[in-house]
């Protein structure tokens, strides 16, 4: 009898561990899409100091921009409220991985290195890195191969500088306005960022006549929505909505609001959002 009791106790313990393990496995594989819908809100990491992608509106004090309009469209598709989480380039992925953000919609370039730690949607924007320099400076990119160049921490531009110009001195800043201040003060001889961000930055600068954007590209880059690794259901919804925005013409309308001919940083739209 004692042997039987011991056997039953061992079996019950094993079943308990199995059940607990099953619960833990289920929790580990929790569907973030379902969690977002249950919470009724999607938290989106976006910029608040990088116009025209994301910046503070001086009148409303709301974050507005190209990325914000896409975030609004995604929240509408999910059927939940939108909560914007202000970020800078270096904090984008940590916010996502820590659960403080559900999505990254913050001008984040798709790279193999980043794709190892987060998943990316199909690109919803295509851009390139350029240089902003004093108006009387050299016009060729290679003329800055040994210069002091400002970049934003955690960006592909920062990485591209080290690869393209290993003899340059790269100084990193938390955001692009700080980099521009360094350029004004003569601490750096050039700064680099996405072409569209530089155009928006220069358009708003009171001393814009003192600077110019060099025509050559440091790199060509595709921008996607960042999703936590393995959240396939959420990623599929994001991709479906991005493609739908293109098909309905709404993606082009959003682009025109921020980059159209009437804007401070006009640029022709040379891409389409396509399923991959």
Which role does the model predict for each range below?
Residues 54-58, 71-80, 157-174, 202-206:
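Ligand-binding cleft/hinge of the Venus flytrap
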Residues 133-149:
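Flexible hinge/capping segments at coil-to-helix
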Residues 160-173, 242-276:
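Ligand-binding clefts/hinges and TM-proximal coupling segments of bilobed small-molecule sensing domains
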Residues 68, 83-94, 136, 153, ...:
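Short helix-initiation/N-cap motifs at beta->coil->alpha
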Residues 48, 125-132, 195, 199-242, ...:
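Periplasmic-binding protein-like
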Residues 23-30:
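Sec/Tat signal peptide C-region and signal peptidase I cleavage site
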Residues 76-77, 85-86, 90-103, 117-119, ...:
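Short helices/loops that flank or line small-molecule/ion binding pockets
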Residues 31-107:
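Extracytoplasmic small-molecule ligand-binding "clamshell" domains
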